């Protein structure tokens, strides 16, 4: 049960980090 809860918490965090990095790269490219 703990593994399921961990996945439910970690997966959204990984998605948020991925989106954040993607937007950051796009922003840096536009600023350059």
UniProtKB/Swiss-Prot annotation:
It is found in: Plastid, Chloroplast thylakoid membrane. GO terms for biological process: photosynthesis. It comes from the Eukaryota. Keywords: Chloroplast, Electron transport, Membrane, Photosynthesis, Plastid, Thylakoid, Transmembrane, Transmembrane helix, Transport. Its main location: plastid. The chain crosses the membrane at residues 4-24. One of its GO terms (cellular component) is chloroplast thylakoid membrane. It is a single-pass membrane protein. Component of the cytochrome b6-f complex, which mediates electron transfer between photosystem II (PSII) and photosystem I (PSI), cyclic electron flow around PSI, and state transitions. Belongs to the PetM family. The 4 large subunits of the cytochrome b6-f complex are cytochrome b6, subunit IV (17 kDa polypeptide, PetD), cytochrome f and the Rieske protein, while the 4 small subunits are PetG, PetL, PetM and PetN. The complex functions as a dimer. This is Cytochrome b6-f complex subunit 7. It comes from Cyanidioschyzon merolae (strain NIES-3377 / 10D) (Unicellular red alga). The gene is petM.
């Amino acid at each position: 049960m703990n593994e399921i809860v961990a996945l439910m918490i970690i997966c959204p965090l990984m998605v948020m980090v991925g989106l954040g990095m993607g937007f950051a790269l796009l922003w840096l490219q536009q600023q350059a």
